[in-house]
Amino acid sequence: MKLVLAEKPSVAQSIAKVLGAAKREDGYLEGNGYVVSWCVGHLVELAQPEVYDAKYSKWAYADLPIFPMDWQYEVSAGTKKQFGILKKLMAREDVASLVCATDAGREGELIFRLVYHKAGCRKPFERLWISSMEDVAIKEGFENLRSGTEYDALYEAALCRERADWIVGINATRLFRPFTGRP
């Protein structure tokens, strides 16, 4: 059995139709040797500063800049149910491997990998890389799956972008907020 993880429900439904996974369950579709589920965007995100150190719960200029030494991730508040479903699916004994079917690009790769790592999954995964949701493109994509490790550099680039955004965003917001007159 392969677990296919798409970025959004609509994409998962298109993929499931092509693969013959027609049995609907809560948060996924199953059939024909496949379980097809989805992420609903970013299920896992970087933790807020106060998770790293309680002193960051109060904004103080003296605490800037904030540079985490060990990056921490949390399941997004509004996606805990779907994350729980994905974690259970990844742990199923009959699921031997996964297919990353998130959007073809840096962010899609990041979305899949963060869920995969946060769920503690160690099963092998392959990458579906398609730019069309036409049935023929999906079928061809599944006939040409690539090893997930071929996209490690793309994942690393996404991590760098995400962490750089966090560093600039958190520090700039805390630095300049007093000058805006907003609490």
In which residue ranges do the predicted regions lie?
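Intrinsically disordered, low-complexity regulatory segments
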Residues: M1-F179
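Functional cation/ligand-contacting sites centered on basic and imidazole/sulfhydryl donors
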Residues: P183
